């Protein structure tokens, strides 16, 4: 919400400085995001009156103006603006003036005529991006007044960053109400009286969706002068609030929206057919908006229509075919209350965000439409003339938001805030906020006004009191109570162990959104069944994640673009598959590595991370299940998002529980990644089912190492060799490990040489050579029989 300090002070004018006002707003929860001067710095510019205008003797596009700045004599100024005319008040930069663009005004001779200054446009003063002629000023009492004083440029624009629940402050009226409470200052509202109907013209209104639009007001205005310029004061208040002037009618509706908080819309009455209908759209119904956007509507979009076509997106933006222009003389004014739940998300669904939708989706006071209608009508008739018809109102009170009644207990206030607030002050502050307060035995019975959608519970009122008392003034009191140890479930403790394992391996935990980009997720998990959100935060957060990889890959992109060369992320969270009726939520642990295998150091030659680095990290997680680690195996398999030659499926007792591998090269190219990325994903439930450790005393007898080298077919995975060894049941085989793989010279092309290290040890006695040799011969025979191995000497 952006507004000018001067406008606010016409409503409430506390005796505090500008800096204090900004600070008080921020401390009260209305965070001031920025303040800026309402005009660019310039000096030497006066409010001047053009007395006479004559054609330039030798330049047909120029005029010679005689200008009065109250100095006793007229100044000759050469000007090329088309709107320069006698009687016009305009800004004059005198000799020596400094303009915002760094321009210094000097005595100049234009086509033989000396010019003693420059008449200025709004653009030349930094008040607009572009302008076609001189800035036309309101008539003053005396020419020659400094323009800063003449136009009250000693002002600032204040922009407040409001939280979504404070829609009541999306207006000058709402901000003024807050300032009045904070400073105990009176609030002076403009007098808004009902406008008496001068004509009997009405335009029928039908509301077929009362739950979506419980209140709709319309009014016919005839004979409005379309050539009337928006008054300077109104244009300036809009500009200082960040809104461009777009013509009188639009300016007035925007002004009322900023002043009172009620978005309005004006239709060209002569372009409407039959009557207004407030209804839901029809499938594939067409609508062209005021900004030229062509839409195909759906059946969940609330629209304003006539008997022939859709006219506007309700609460969002009007349509081109019914919009007003500089020839419009007859208007139909709309002022309505739309249910926030109906408007929320529709603007984003169509890729739109307007001041109107911003307010309606947060909640507009349902009692405000009539007041806004009268205010807009009065302004239009006062400025542009015309005649107003009666107000037509269609309302369903049963569909309006109920006004909550809350019991506020004094003891509860003290217990939550830790400070005693005088009863009289509580009553005064709540009343100033617009709440109806009645004293009862235990505290107060408070009736919430229609404009406060955020007040529903007792704690909401206590929060208001704390906010107005001042969060900075609340005492800091340590809680007193018994400290109880936090009891974690086995599942909670297990994920903490996984976290610790990964952190020890130099990973960082990431927490990403559960809402993800549908296109990216389709690339990473094309077989998933994502749940599409009806009301997405944005178009790139439109579906629920079916895999954690989507968020991790986006995090990789973000960090890569910021020159992070070594990235190791993991995330624990839920994935969502299916639709609402059969939605499957699954706890998942996933990780991603990219860049160097280990941090740069002097003692090791750097190398990029590879598939086996990631596999080692996954094996470290699987080792947490104890003896049941042997239930897991890695099988080469194909995944659409992974490199076809560097991907594996993780199985537990034959059932798929996860994936790991390198990101597909095509995806790396599409995502513009600078280095190869490796990912894993694992169902947490699969690794939670482990066995408790069983104590085994260490053998005091020596361990013996034996190495076996053999040839097998090149297409046999090492995992098959390991499975073969696991089948060799023995009480002396403590450990086996692959320590060499060789292909090339001296080996048949269809073979590979593997070398295994076997560690043998018995818990009760020293192994003899005979016992060891018998076991080794048994292992070699098993390899030959099961795998067709050729033992190497």
Swiss-Prot record:
Q: Which family does it belong to?
A: Belongs to the phenylalanyl-tRNA synthetase beta subunit family. Type 1 subfamily.
**According to the record, how does the cofactor bind?**
Binds 2 magnesium ions per tetramer.
Q: What is its EC number?
A: 6.1.1.20
> Which PROSITE patterns does its entry note?
B5, FDX_ACB, TRBD
Q: What sequence ranges are listed for the domain B5? A: 401-476
Species, as recorded: Nitrosococcus oceani (strain ATCC 19707 / BCRC 17464 / JCM 30415 / NCIMB 11848 / C-107)
Q: What is this protein called?
A: Phenylalanine--tRNA ligase beta subunit
Per UniProt, subcellular location reads as: Cytoplasm
Chief location bin: cytoplasm
Where is the tRNA-binding domain positioned along the sequence? 39-148
